[in-house]
């Protein structure tokens, strides 16, 4: 909390998010925005190798997040995607845990973590997890935070199944060939 003095991004370290989400979050935060998240298009986050869980975003008419609906067992099909037999709109925006936050959020996070550590952990010592999306969802429900959803059309890559490794490697090779990334990532710094 003493190091983060400017707006920042929180991501999962083992996922690939693309460039657009970072750019959108950066632009929003440097213009004075406080809290935002990258909303990935559902079809750009699915695995060819099995079902996945995604947080489908509900928003108001101004693209403010109102709720994240955790939806399990989402699979691709001929029409797009479904979860347990229910057709899903593949253009829906989903949370892939890419948050843009202001330093002031750290105080709220700290008090939430303290409550979690004192009240939740003792009841479930082995499996208790403090999840930022869950915490932000609670803050939304209490009206204590407003989160702008910023659409990104980039493809998200994760390693949900071991079979995903080949597809992810092929995608990165293709990005190198197209010049999206350089072989030496930091050569231009």
Question: Residue ranges of each PLM-predicted region?
Answer:
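Hydrophobic helical membrane-anchoring modules
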Residues: 143-146, 153-189
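A conserved donor-nucleotide-binding helix/loop in the catalytic core
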Residues: 1-2
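Glycine-rich loop/turn
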Residues: 80-87, 131, 137-154
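Short aromatic/hydrophobic "clamp" motif used to bind/position activated sugar donors
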Residues: 8-9
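A C-terminal functional module that forms or caps the active site or interfaces directly
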Residues: 110-145
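Alpha-helix/helix-capping structural signal
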Residues: 103-104, 163
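Conserved core of the sugar-phosphate nucleotidyltransferase
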Residues: 18-99, 103
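The conserved acidic donor/metal-binding loop of glycosyltransferases
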Residues: 13-16
